[in-house]
Amino acid sequence: MSGFSTEERAAPFSLEYRVFLKNEKGQYISPFHDIPIYADKDVFHMVVEVPRWSNAKMEIATKDPLNPIKQDVKKGKLRYVANLFPYKGYIWNYGAIPQTWEDPGHNDKHTGCCGDNDPIDVCEIGSKVCARGEIIGVKVLGILAMIDEGETDWKVIAINVDDPDAANYNDINDVKRLKPGYLEATVDWFRRYKVPDGKPENEFAFNAEFKDKDFAIDIIKSTHDHWKALVTKKTNGKGISCMNTTLSESPFKCDPDAARAIVDALPPPCESACTVPTDVDKWFHHQKN
């Protein structure tokens, strides 16, 4: 969407790498807290964390000031998702809806599990491969209820409103009709993507059935309410940084100079990326259960 831009710090695929978001005035903002949930009527903003076909597990750093995008780290090593045959990296543009939060203190009535302490995830199914940190408007189509190591981890299915075919997609059944096999592949991907790392398969509520647009929007609105409680200090943040530059009702609001100081303290941008390990291109063959 127009008005937002990104600024990288340090080298991509390094432990220090960060992507910060800026508004139309060039001021640093939090992609978690300062970008409005809605881009337009019935259109949600999406923060793209991982472009389709890529492997680096980038995510909004919920516990860092200003919540830049960074690569996830496990046991001191940068995380890359495996290529689980027949897939290459992520099979959609993957990211999050801003101003949402899956509250780890809230037991979801649909799943019986508490939230995963992150913004709600989005799988964008359009034709364009988006850029890391890009802010797009999406039309919500449905939702999948994944259970990840005992936590609720909703996956919203959506399409970029600027996609040439966006007008043809209005609910989850349109995805089934126009992209046969895509939803089945989505379940398969989420079920098995951690197996190459030695983890068990993920589970799903509703027997891995996708719920429709109206159900999805209700879930998103619920996570938005949880986020409101978070940034107004009405609930325990569980270590999350709520620093923001736009929310007048939030005690965590800071001025632009304080936000700039956060960024200026980090390594400068680097023109060249670090080398990605060659085994990231490996294909994993795993028997489906």
From Swiss-Prot:
GO terms for molecular function: inorganic diphosphate phosphatase activity; magnesium ion binding. Homodimer. Its cofactor is Mg(2+). The modification Phosphoserine is found at residue 250. CDD domains: pyrophosphatase (cd00412). It is found in: Cytoplasm. The modification N6-acetyllysine is found at residues 57, 228. It catalyses: diphosphate + H2O = 2 phosphate + H(+). Keywords: Acetylation, Cytoplasm, Hydrolase, Magnesium, Metal-binding, Phosphoprotein. Mg(2+) 1 binds at residues 116, 121, 153. GO terms for cellular component: cytoplasm; cytosol; extracellular exosome. Pfam families: Pyrophosphatase (PF00719). Its EC number is 3.6.1.1. GO terms for biological process: phosphate-containing compound metabolic process. The keyword Hydrolase applies. This is Inorganic pyrophosphatase. Belongs to the PPase family. The lineage of its organism: Eukaryota, Metazoa, Chordata, Craniata, Vertebrata. Mg(2+) 2 binds at residue 121. It is an enzyme of class 3 (hydrolase). Expressed ubiquitously. InterPro entries: Pyrophosphatase, Pyrophosphatase_sf. Its main location: cytoplasm. The modification N-acetylserine is found at residue 2.
